[in-house]
Amino acid sequence: DNWMDSRIARFETRTYDWDALKFQADFDPKYARAQCRYMGTGGTGISNDENVVPAEHFTFSTMVLPSGCEGPPHIHVDVEEVFFMLKGSIRLTIEKGNDFFETILKERDLASVPPGYYRGLYNIGQEEALMLVMLGNKKPVTPHYPPDHPLSKIKRSKK
């Protein structure tokens, strides 16, 4: 292994991890989506993936969102989260206190969500959507859900 190899993550060596957020899909299939990690392990709670470029300042992954998929509202207390749409369209919701924002992200659109805001998404298209997800810390704190959301009651195992 040389230094260059340790800094490159090739698509051909990635796998779509449908289990990264499986506890959500087990609760309701509408939450089924796949993470493909490139740099760091992201904010899904996965920590044992050694097939990534080590994160130094942020994480970088893609998410495959089937048609009708919903990403439940969640909050990152420690990091900015950036979404960049590669394919498809999603409805993005952002909420903090009494402030509520909603927009449609299409191909090549970017949204930045600061720490401390709830964010959720829904694939409004008839085909799968693909988006880049970046979190602004090499080891983000696992996000949590609004207290009244059913997923907030589920205990998930560490991976």
Language-model region placement:
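Conserved short histidine dyad/triad with adjacent acidic residue
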Residues: 40-49, 59-77, 115
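His/acidic/aromatic-lined binding-pocket segments of jelly-roll/cupin-type domains
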Residues: 62-63, 74-75, 80-85, 103, ...
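Short acidic-glycine-tyrosine-enriched beta hairpin
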Residues: 96-115
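Short histidine-centered beta-strand/loop micro-motifs
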Residues: 48-54, 71-77, 94, 102-104, ...
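Glycine- and acidic-residue-biased ligand/ion/polar-headgroup-sensing regions
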Residues: 67, 78-91, 96
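A short, N-terminal "cap"/entry segment at the start of jelly-roll beta-barrel domains
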Residues: 1-57, 149, 156-159
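Histidine-centered metal-chelating micro-motifs
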Residues: 70-72, 91, 110-111, 115-120
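Double-stranded beta-helix
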Residues: 1-9, 103, 118-159
